[in-house]
């Protein structure tokens, strides 16, 4: 798309989906609503796509970039897609209340974390692929105008990952019922929302595009002895299967493998039953994490297997060492998909 090409809209509007009424101090308050901004092009291909941002982000990241260029929204509009950009419940324009949603994580305003993981990986990244990074405009360091604009766009994320997935699943179900058949694109912390949406609406979600989805399965990893600020509550210890440049958490963070909240498995999990993780015995190269799968016999993700899926990972990203784990988890669970790294 030409960066200056004109895009005409048939309709542009804002609305909210999801939410439940909760009584707080004798007041009835709507909790878990999701902000949606819709863009309907004048020249439509009669296809829809829902864009779900990641942690520390809002839907604005799909509209424009930190250096002022057009975001992915405009690319999809130029190809005729009707685009629905959301702010996750409890985030940005969906509204936040500590009474309703609890504590925030502190990572979104952590400058060192942002430089290392997002903007200056070649200089500060502590995983093997970081040296390949060359795409960020400007220096990627504090004091740089584009970096400061990026940091100003960051918004806090609530700590309760299970609850945010449950609220988002409810809101996305309502949105999908409203717009009909759709593609769902989720980024990073919003990546697993693709799995949740496909699980609850497998006949309406035509495809999932998971851009560096939250992972790896079950256990988190810490690079170079430095924990990402959102992992501060977890304990890490060197395992026999860890490479010298990372450590794996002692306890699982995602009890459902690729999500915090439940998915539909066959055979189904009982109320008091959990997936059992087991290290993948297929050895990975030195620059890749040794990830976990289900203990065999593996349960199948019967609803996700009905949906076209693409996992997309950038070569220098901190996801690059471990997103194969998500791909292998889906494969073991009977889900055909494409994985590009």
PLM regions and their residue ranges:
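N-terminal cap/lid segment of alpha/beta-hydrolase-fold proteins
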Residues: 2-44
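Short, surface-exposed "cap/lid" segments of acyl-processing enzymes
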Residues: 43-45, 49-85, 91-132
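A conserved short beta-strand
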Residues: 203-222
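Catalytic histidine neighborhood in serine/cysteine hydrolases
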Residues: 331-341
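Gly/Ala-rich beta-loop-alpha elbow adjacent to hydrolase catalytic centers
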Residues: 185-194
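Conserved acidic catalytic loop of the alpha/beta-hydrolase fold
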Residues: 135-137, 141-155, 159-183
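Short beta-strand/loop motif that positions the catalytic acidic residue
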Residues: 305, 311-313
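Conserved alpha/beta-hydrolase "acid-adjacent" motif
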Residues: 193, 317-325
